[in-house]
Amino acid sequence: MGQRGMSSMSCNTTILPKAFKRKSCLISRTIRHSLGLTGEGKSMAGSILKQERLLLLAIPAAIIAYMTEHAIFEAGKTAALIAAIVLIGLIVLISMRVAHHAEILAAKVGDPYGTMILTLSAVAVEVLILAIIMSESSSPTLVRDTIYSAVMIDINGILGLAALLGGLRHGEQPYNDDSGKTYGVMILTAMGISMIVPEFIPEQSWHLYSAFTIVAMIALYALFLKMQVGPHSYFFSYAYPRKAHPAGQPSHGHAEEEDEGSVPLSIGLIIAGVVLIGVLAEFMSTFLSESLEGTSAPPALMAVVVATISASPEILTALRSALRNRMQAVVNIAMGASLSTVILTVPVMEGIALYTGQPFIMAMTPVQTVMVFITLIAAAINLNDGETNAIEGMTHFILFATFIMLLFLGL
């Protein structure tokens, strides 16, 4: 007899007392639902598996990479480069799924918590990949170059392109200018303490200043976080007018706030995605290092790859927000990601340096310092009046193009 027949018999029999019959039916339905034996449960499970096929694909990809690692090395640099590119693409796609579920959580809690969840998930990916690569690499400048690249990508790349495209479509786009000012001064302070002052610290005192930097970054971020979610939360939000909809037509004003699945499910998939990224990143870094060894590739290419992987989900989210005329979300994402990268990555990596006894070179080069100052000055001017436009976006995007040019020049 089938499951449906068994259920029908157990619930419709007249032999048992009514109270016992109701209780047994309730227990039966609960068990069948928890085991996914109902049509609704099967449909939901199938839908989740279909949506998260990229996460599932990462598991056999990691197994294949593990089993073929030595064969790829023996095949030469070209094979290693192809394997690294494939893994980078897969890591980016998984990062986008992580960002997707971060957006689901963000839609449930609203700003500023929403964009904070998104940027923290991106920073978690970046720190994890950095830690894995640093365990296999002897480059003392990788952390510095990655943070510098992330700031260039976030402010000049993401903010610049979003303001440019949004300005071309909507003209002037409003946002809360308090957020731009707050982010700007925090980024300047954090980068000054952690990436400019170290140039003047005696080598024998690096561990003392490293410990101070950790405390300073944590103190800055703790107060910033308290203000962002507390008394000054209005700094990071903007009240956009609701669009009117014709009678009889459903409102799609919150189409972007996807309500797919539960909060625990999204949290679980974010954690699973970050773990899978870490596993794939270990193989990716090995293959990429092997393929670039002895070539004329720019020294900072690995750092740019790490920064791009962590920023890739934010790029799509920011562009969608700009084209919807939601510039506040763009500012929170671009500037918030830059701040989070500096203020959270630095203490973690400095802590690793103190633990291992091997210092990193955190002081920026003169070219990097000049680019950061030009970027932050331009951001301070452009984000000072509560509206962005295409010209302001173009200035940042040209700075991003300059960053790419300097990368290929080895600067």
Model region roles, listed by residue range:
Residues 13-14, 30:
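Intrinsically disordered, charged low-complexity linkers and terminal tails
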Residues 34-411:
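Hydrophobic alpha-helical segments, chiefly the membrane-spanning helices
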